[in-house]
Amino acid sequence: MDKYIKLPKELNAIEGHLHIHSLFEKERQMTFIGGHEWYKNELNFRGINIAALPRNASNNMACALYKVANPDAYAHGCFYYPVSPLKEKIEGLDPLTQYNELMEIGFDGMKMLEGKPNLHKLIGRDLNNKYFDEFYTELEKDKTHLLFHVNDPDEFWDETKVCQEHKDRGWFYGDGTYTSYEGIYEQIDEIMEKHPTLCVNFAHFYFKSKRPQDLEKMFEKYPNMGVDITPGGEMYLSFDDNYDYYRSFFIKYSERIQLGTDSTFPDGGEACKWLLDRVYRYIATDDSFKGFNNRIHKGFNLPKEAKENIIYKNFERTVGTEPKKINKEALKRYIEKYKHLMSDDENAKIQQLCEKYL
């Protein structure tokens, strides 16, 4: 018997929140293409969505190349910042230009990590800065889906509550040099007031699991806004602590909630299986199981309609029932434009993949 639950194939499940952290894994002698294909097939997903990260210039290229290799895959593109903090607008690298390039290539949506406090500080531009205005306007007009990481758990601003592991990862924000927890939300409030029909999914339950009433108000106000249930484990502890309320919440707002795990390549294998097992059990079964912070959770065992909404229907409704096809010529132009911003090693690996897939 398998140690972890596998998704029933008839669910047509879509993994909405994956990443690529490197192009190649030495241990398994595997590229990210093989790694994510293993993940998709091993766990019985109908489709997966890879969200690019502004780590380096090659991340968008890798996501697009994965879509070429696996045309049933989705991908969300991201902005690349050649310098930080941004002192001025860089011609040809502004958000609107980059957005249009990514849409021409055939990305299915956009990913922004810019709301994570450490990256927010590094870039040096508030989320509601006029630098992004044209992009938000075009995004709203086009009804393009945005997967948006905004904030982190509130305890990351409190030195007495943030754990050492998170401090070591650079996730303590209470030294006075970072925008406050509430300050970041205020920036989003201004964006949403200005663009109320923006098709946006806030990752990690918008870090509002302690204040779900805030989400309820936003759901009533913004028709195309939702959240995903990608761990942070802290949200699942809040679900436990308010079990009956949250089970009703998930049923009532099942059309605003999407499945995701935040799994990455090359950190695959057992860790990915463990994450999906916990998330799926929580929404789809009434199992009691050990999960986040070694807490014993009890699953919500949501009704069929609510489960299907969360597991695949909401993604299809907001992103698309079928992925967009990659425009290979547009991708070649993008690689040519950005290749000088990559290391020699990245260039070599991307070139090898281009020779195989383009």
Question: What residue ranges belong to the model's regions?
Answer:
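An N-terminally biased module of ancient metal coordination in phosphate/nucleic-acid-related enzymes
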Residues: 1-68
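Acidic (Asp/Glu)-rich catalytic clusters
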Residues: 6-8, 37-44, 61-74, 97-107, ...
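Histidine-centered catalytic micro-motifs
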Residues: 12-23, 147-151, 202-206
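Active-site neighborhood of phospho(di)ester-bond hydrolases with catalytic His/Asp-centered motifs
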Residues: 13-16, 49-54, 75-79, 111, ...
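Acidic-and-aromatic substrate-binding clefts and catalytic sites of carbohydrate-active enzymes
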Residues: 22-32, 51-61, 82-93, 118-127, ...
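Distinct, well-ordered alpha-helical segments
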Residues: 59-67, 88-92, 96-99, 123, ...
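Active-site gating/metal-coordination segments in enzymes
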Residues: 60-171
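H/E-rich (His + Asp/Glu) clusters that bind or coordinate divalent metals
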Residues: 183, 199-358
